[in-house]
Amino acid sequence: MRKERDAMNIHSCHRSKPAVLVQLVLILSWLTHIQMTDTYFYVCALIACGGIFCTCENYRHNLPRSRGTWIRVLLFSAVFSLSSILGNYSLFEPFTSLTNLFRMALSFLGGLSLGGNVLAYLLWVFPGLQAAEEKRNHPGRVFALSFGVIVLIDLVYLLLVEWPGVLTRDSMDQIRQIITGKYSNANPYWHTVTVGIFVKLGLLVTGDLHWGVALFSIFQILYLAGCFSYAVMTLYQKGAPRWCLWAVWAGYALIPYQIVYSVTVWKDILFSGASLLLTVALYRLLYPVEKEEKRDWILFVLGGAGLCLWRTNGLLVIAMLLMALALAGRKNKKLAAVLAVILVIGLVLCGPVLSLMGIRGAGLAETLSIPLQQVARVCYDGAAIAREDLELIRTVAEPEEFAGVYQSYLSDPVKGLLRRSAGYEQLKADPLPYLKLWLRMGLRHPISYLKAWIDQTKGYWNAGYSYWITAEGIYENEFGLVSRPGNIVGTVFDKLMRYAELMPLMHPLFSIGLYTWLTGICCFVNRQRRRPEWLLSLPWLVILFGLLIGTPVYAEFRYAYPVMLA
């Protein structure tokens, strides 16, 4: 790493003290202008402190005059700065005010300075984590210890608090499909089949549905513990400092939402584990840590298969990773070939096979979350709508109805209005006029469209929002599935979880946007250094892209669980 940095420092310069002071003032200005934000302000303050530290450190070092690199650094920083303004646009309204425009300009320059200094520090100053000098000859012991303790913690939680597992409305829909044999792909069919293997086994052996659900919960505990321990073992073998190993292990084992998710029957949990499995296996194949790679190849294939089958956007992740590997060079030919096979099999299983089985998807409305929100926002804002557009809107509902059900952070009410309308069938039969309607209204009301998009997606790229993270118990059902009555252990754990969510010091653990930007920074820095680790960031960035164009909820933590793990 030091050689790479030295190579980039051939032409360097030292910045003047006044310039550094101006940048520090701008960073503080950025923080001051968003102090009334509805996001996690502590996360913003933490980011600002990081920017101040990096600015001071950069002042003590000579930075290169690499024009191309600096342009890319400034472009990346501009995107960060602009996103912080857009995510808090309500603090700068009305936009016609000269004072607010001046505040926006200062805030933008502050974010630009903050981002630029952080990236410059990571590219040219940060020495990197030093690998441990002692020999690491016991990876098996590390894996076994990590695995055993995580399994023990999660099993205790399952047995004492959430037996036989946590089942929400979506989970109960999957259980209903398994019991009745009437399947759909609203929740991924192959995930439902995976749950069904354990549910049916439990019913076969005990005749009790509770044991069927419990068997799946136990499988998920073992699966996640294995994925987590595989990551910890890899860091151990690569010489990560002991404090880093303990911090990563504690993040997997002790953060409350990790424990709850281990027994929650959601597609997102297994999918996120597969994302971590694929990422770690890919890293080990790019940088072999053992002479025998057969196990890593097997886990790489299993992780890729899980991504393809357990959530619909997994196929896009594999496709983009395949393209990146193909463009990265011939030395990745074997990896690309394996991914290509995984992708083809996934496409067949999720396409023609489901069609032949007569299994239908979630419906058109589920793919229209953001377009529907944008049209509803125009109605909500009371903007003037052209007569031709008004007539087409009324085939679904009156503008007043759209305005009445619109919620800026959730598309379900608007989607429900669409499904109940007589115009829904017309939309499915002939979507082109409605597409043209959406485009015309966007050109006439760009501000309303932009606000609707920001409010619907900002939880995934802004500093973080207080929104539900975990579920508990079993959703009301007709199968007699009930949770175990509450006890003192469950009460204490629930209070700890709530306190953790409320404590500002813990907010970085719950900030999706913080993890998103950290992932983006890792991708950018590694790409600039021409290190293949940038590929490890792709799974989350592709998932993020899918959320930005179609999320139904503005800050659904489980949707972002892959980045929390990886």
Model-derived segments and spans:
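Membrane-interface alpha helices of multi-pass inner-membrane proteins
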Residues: 296-311, 321-323, 342-346
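Membrane-proximal stem/loop segments at transmembrane-domain junctions that anchor or position
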Residues: 359-485
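Start-transfer (signal-anchor) and selected internal transmembrane alpha helices
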Residues: 2-26, 45-78, 99-155
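Extracytoplasmic catalytic/substrate-binding loops of multi-pass membrane glycan-assembly enzymes
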Residues: 162-174, 182-198, 202-211
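Membrane-interface anchor segments at the N-terminal boundary of transmembrane helices
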Residues: 27-46, 211-215, 452-537
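Transmembrane-helix motifs of polytopic, lipid-linked glycan transferases
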Residues: 218-239
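Short acidic/glycine- and proline-prone juxtamembrane loop motifs at membrane-interface regions
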Residues: 260-271, 310
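Specific aromatic-rich, kink-prone transmembrane helix
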Residues: 179, 230, 272-288, 304, ...
